[in-house]
Regions:
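Conserved two-lobed SF2 helicase motor
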Residues: 136-155
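Walker A/P-loop
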Residues: 52-75
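Hydrophobic positions in the central parallel beta-sheet of the AAA+
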Residues: 58, 143-146, 170
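SF2 helicase catalytic motif II
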Residues: 148-152, 158-204
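Conserved pre-motif I regulatory segment
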Residues: 21-59
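Conserved Walker A/P-loop ATP-binding site and its immediately adjacent core
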Residues: 67-69, 82-106
């Protein structure tokens, strides 16, 4: 994704806020960020995803709310279980920051950004991994946002591969990138029970 496309995504997000209406007054609880609630097609996307054993590809045009649609699925998980756990992969550092902002709109907290731009995330990941290993029934909520480049590095991959595959929602933005070389090989080694791919171009040439 080039810089011009990333800027377009930011502009479309701003227009989307206007279209949805005034944001919901914030509380400590995760919630949908707009008073109008999710659109019909976003509700249907969640229902289809749930029917398909919580697996699916959301192939949607730019500006139609792929990010909101996928985070709404995480919100529905929270409503049912009382906690949320997610690993989100994106192709660029700019999108790491953009996804963090979208998570904040839903009031998703404890966001860990895994990429070369930031430091300290190794300790945060290690602490959460230890909690998951020592207390598998914990209800600690967190969202890990990583670039594909950071995800496929051996040390990071080993760390992330120890997170609970049956409780964590895996979201791959620009999912057609997963068809590339080492990324595809790494993902073949991980079997997440809950998966969402996001793409405007699902067919890889």
């Amino acid at each position: 994704m080039d810089n011009s496309k990333e800027r377009l995504e930011v502009i479309l997000d701003k227009l989307k806020e206007i279209e949805y209406g005034v944001a919901v007054i914030r509380s400590n609880e995760p919630q949908f960020p707009y008073t109008s609630g999710p659109r019909d097609y976003q509700i249907q996307a969640f229902e289809n995803w749930k029917t398909n054993k919580q697996k699916g590809l959301f192939a949607m045009a730019t500006g139609t709310g792929k990010t909101i649609t996928s985070l709404n699925c995480l919100l529905e998980i929270y409503k049912r279980l009382g906690y949320y756990k997610a690993l989100i992969l994106v192709p660029t550092i700019t999108l790491v920051d953009q996804w963090e902002k979208e998570c904040a709109k839903f009031n998703f907290t404890n966001v860990i950004k895994v990429c070369s731009k930031y430091s300290g995330w190794q300790t945060s990941l290690a602490n959460i991994r230890m909690l998951e290993l020592t207390n598998p029934d914990n209800k600690q909520s967190y969202v890990i946002i990583s670039t594909y480049a950071s995800f496929i590095r051996p040390a990071n991959f080993i760390e992330l591969n120890q997170f609970p595959k049956n409780k964590l929602l895996f979201i791959a933005d620009e999912a057609h990138n997963m068809g590339a070389g080492l990324i595809a090989k790494r993902l073949n080694d991980i079997k997440y029970s809950r998966r969402i791919g996001l793409s405007a171009t699902p067919e890889r040439q």
